[in-house]
Regions:
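Alpha-helical metal-binding/catalytic segments enriched in His/Glu/Asp
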Residues: 13-19, 103
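Phosphate-binding and adjacent anionic-ligand microenvironments
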Residues: 6, 26-203, 208-213
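Short, basic/hydrophobic alpha-helical segments
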Residues: 20-26
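Short Gly/Thr/Asp-enriched flexible loops that form oxyanion-binding sites at enzyme active sites
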Residues: 1-15, 43
Length: 213
């Protein structure tokens, strides 16, 4: 990550937003591949403000890079694969997982904007960020933790589909992601199974005070 002129950290969703804004210059309508826990505000920023497309995929930097390579091979303009953890790979840099390259791109962009009398934070001024967010990690005690986790996700998906004010995301590709209307938390959660460990991380975000609870 980095820090802008106001002392705000450029990390997680904000880092993805900055990288996407840079990557989409000269790539109008391009596809940005991210991991699964990116915010709803980031999707809106990429698609509505930048005019790009957002492909929310799975956790793991190799997963997002491989998906970007696959999309490009299919003829889809995909200039960037990035995780909220900061792992980033750009097509112009042969999709190498290269944090130094991204940092250099950000520094160059900041210098260009400074010459225009602007600051880097203006690049993502319209990014809507959640009021509250948290992550809870549930440990699975069953011996066959993968089968257990997959059953929990399947049961939760079915339950969510039956609830008023809940909406199961149709563009999610890992675990189950559910959005909630203003009367039911005003946000979303994602429950997924860890790639290697008997853990089920639950990521929750809300745009209202007390919404996470």
């Amino acid at each position: 990550g980095a820090v802008d002129s106001k002392g705000n950290e450029i990390n997680r969703n904000r880092l993805v937003a900055v990288a996407a804004a840079i990557a989409l210059e000269g790539n109008d309508g391009g596809m940005i591949v991210t991991d699964s826990i990116t915010s709803s505000g980031l999707k809106q920023f990429i698609e509505n403000d930048l005019g790009g497309k957002h492909y929310r995929y799975r956790r793991g930097y190799k997963n997002v890079i491989d998906k970007a390579l696959e999309l490009n091979a299919q003829g889809i303009n995909c200039p960037l694969a990035i995780e909220t953890s900061g792992h980033a790979a750009m097509r112009e840099n042969y999709f190498l997982d290269d944090g130094a390259y991204l940092c250099t791109k950000i520094i160059i962009k900041a210098a260009q904007m400074r010459k225009e009398g602007k600051e880097l934070d203006e690049l993502t001024a319209s990014l809507k960020e959640p009021l509250e967010s948290t992550e809870i990690r549930y440990k699975i005690l069953e011996k066959d933790f993968r089968a257990c986790g997959e059953k929990i996700i399947a049961d939760l998906t079915k339950y969510a589909e039956e609830q008023d004010g809940w909406c199961v995301a149709d563009d999610n590709r890992e675990g189950v992601r559910v959005s909630f209307d203003r009367d039911n938390g005003d946000g979303w959660f994602l429950l997924r199974l860890s790639v290697h460990d008997p853990i089920m991380p639950l990521n929750v975000e809300s745009d209202s005070e007390g919404g996470v609870k």
